[in-house]
Amino acid sequence: MGLPWYRVHTVVLNDPGRLISVHLMHTALVAGWAGSMALYELAIFDSSDAVLNPMWRQGMFVLPFMARLGVTSSWNGWSVTGETGLDPGFWSFEGVAAAHIVLSGLLFLAAVWHWVFWDLELFVDPRTGESALDLPKMFGIHLFLSGLLCFGFGAFHLTGVWGPGMWVSDPYGLTGHVQPVAPEWGPAGFNPFNPGGVVAHHIAAGIVGIIAGLFHLTVRPPERLYKALRMGNIETVLSSSIAAVFFAAFVVAGTMWYGNATTPIELFGPTRYQWDKGYFQEEIQRRVDSQLAEGASLSEAWSTIPEKLAFYDYVGNSPAKGGLFRTGAMNSGDGIAQEWIGHPIFKDKEGRELEVRRMPNFFETFPVIMTDADGVVRADIPFRRSESKFSVEQTGVTVSFYGGALDGQTFSNPSDVKKFARKAQLGEGFDFDTETFNSDGVFRTSPRGWFTFGHAVFALLFFFGHIWHGSRTLFRDVFAGVDPGLEEQVEFGVFAKVGDLSTRKEA
């Protein structure tokens, strides 16, 4: 038939059996990739430090999605939350990966069967003996089944009735764990950070889907609507399916980038807005002030700050810091975090406490500026020493550390002070191992950034695909000159062109 590469799907346009086959093969490829990718990530994953070297720092992509649904342990005995010596049974990371690979093989065999046995009685109208698909009925079946799945996921898996529940945590991502979640049916269920709303909405949406599916199975569409929306054309199915997919892709791109209820920061890393707002910095300061009010010293107060919370308050963990085309995990950029060095407090020779202005998300380089409590610049690291008025040497800045590895130490050597000021510009300071991965010092984004970028791009492409195929099916008679009411059957897989006398008709 000599089809160009971009028209090859024409061969399944009038062939329901092989249309099923190629969809089965596609699902086999997806399941096979997911299982294989999970095994690859498990092979390179370092589970030794769940606090400073979590999965999102290591560039894991499929493991976080497994963990948020309740799979958190490995047959090697470790858990995402840091425990060791565990026996998770079959439903471990490896077990789920193996299940996907086995499923992929079964789907492959099903695809082969349907490719060979394509001409089934199922696709023939018994009244006329002609090939026919009842697309509105198929729509009802799919709607009913997807509603059933949605309801089952919410009512059983998430609630813990028959399943593990879901990943829940505190607002600062410190206590994350998997637990059953009760549905929240009140106004609080609409709080985007309330996991109970996720459960309630899956149950509600599932019920709506089941009812809608039964409706479409029992009620036929009006003839005018059937013809107006080309409900008898398989390309209508393609167009509306693409619409569902691109809409879902836009939604999940938004929830991934802006939210963390279903994309916990312990599994996917912080959002960029938490750095923009100083979200973790405010919580750290609140905890320190609370300790000071109870009579603790600065050293004691800062020593109560969890290392995990301090690590979130570091700009290198913001997904907006890595360029979209810098490949590799975050650890390939700044290195593997080893320890928190403590909180630095800078003072000039006048005794004023100075604060280093933090680097915004979208800057690669930023001037190191130290301001007093009133926001007045008192010291900096100048670009041109010849014109400097506020250099560390001129202003006599010193730095003292509270909490962390350098607790209680004070540095007055200008080169040391400048080194720690540059670290403070990036948030809380950490020592990094840059040798293990030959880290180049250039920030990378987290899986949160990859997922958002990928889904936003594909959503845009699929949006145009929806417009394209929707236009083709609505205006098929205009584009092809084929009457939409034409009932003459052509050979399966052969494209009927206008005035094409060579197209073989069925006997």
UniProtKB/Swiss-Prot annotation:
Ranges facing Cytoplasmic side: 2-16, 117-134, 219-233, 475-507
Domain of life of the native organism: Bacteria
TM helices/strands, residue ranges: 17-39, 95-116, 135-159, 197-218, 234-255, 451-474
GO MF term set: chlorophyll binding; electron transporter, transferring electrons within the cyclic electron transport pathway of photosynthesis activity
Entry keyword annotation includes Glycosyltransferase: no
Keyword Membrane recorded: yes
Intervals, Lumenal, thylakoid compartment: 40-94, 160-196, 256-450
Keywords linked to the UniProt accession: Chlorophyll, Chromophore, Membrane, Photosynthesis, Photosystem II, Thylakoid, Transmembrane, Transmembrane helix
Pfam family for this entry, one: PSII
One of the GO biological process terms: photosynthetic electron transport in photosystem II
GO cellular component terms, A-Z: plasma membrane-derived thylakoid membrane; plasma membrane-derived thylakoid photosystem II
Cofactor note: Binds multiple chlorophylls. PSII binds additional chlorophylls, carotenoids and specific lipids.
Record HAMAP family: PSII_PsbB_CP47
Stated family: Belongs to the PsbB/PsbC family. PsbB subfamily.
NCBIfam families per record: PS_II_CP47
Assembly mode: PSII is composed of 1 copy each of membrane proteins PsbA, PsbB, PsbC, PsbD, PsbE, PsbF, PsbH, PsbI, PsbJ, PsbK, PsbL, PsbM, PsbT, PsbX, Psb30/Ycf12, peripheral proteins PsbO, CyanoQ (PsbQ), PsbU, PsbV and a large number of cofactors. It forms dimeric complexes. Contacts PsbQ.
Protein name: Photosystem II CP47 reaction center protein
